[in-house]
């Protein structure tokens, strides 16, 4: 979410043909483009406008992370009524504030850690230490800026996976750092939790996910789906509960 920062264009009837509500933007991207580059060629042809969502009973303050199978990733944010595009060399995003602020914060944190030794990664100097001290000094709270820092450094130090399964496991371990459980985030009587997590293998077109009520990892193989149908297919991610495997009989 991009609360307190999202600023959409005002809706005007003469611009109706190229206007999208915030929740329509993702569908537009996925159905019209096959790469980030082709999206960026047409990004200025549409406007994301201010629309009240009657279901959520609010305007949806969104920003967007877009990546393709080549690894090209960008963040798109509605600021002052304009869609601003930021190249995303880290391939990560959290909630507000703006992406450029988050990147400035990462650079500031790198300097403050005063590393004993460093590696260069994605053009950035990343501290490497032993005995678990490499991330000493990173904030551990669940705020979006802190989560951004934690994920940036966790991703920078992950051993390069050799298989799809290894990559998904590495992603799970990275996100485990800041899964928000009930009671950790309460605002105005509303309890905030990490409702679901998704892990996409864009090379093999696999979409894995788990939810707050079902931590069993589930997979959707997009190679087996026909995307030219006219019916929207749905699945309740909380329909089943976590599978706990009984290995008692396997003990020896």
Give residue ranges: language-model regions.
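Aromatic- and glycine-enriched pocket-lining scaffold segments that form the walls
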Residues: 35-36, 40-77
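Short, surface-exposed beta-strand-loop junctions and turns on beta-sheet-rich folds
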Residues: 6-8, 81-83, 213-217
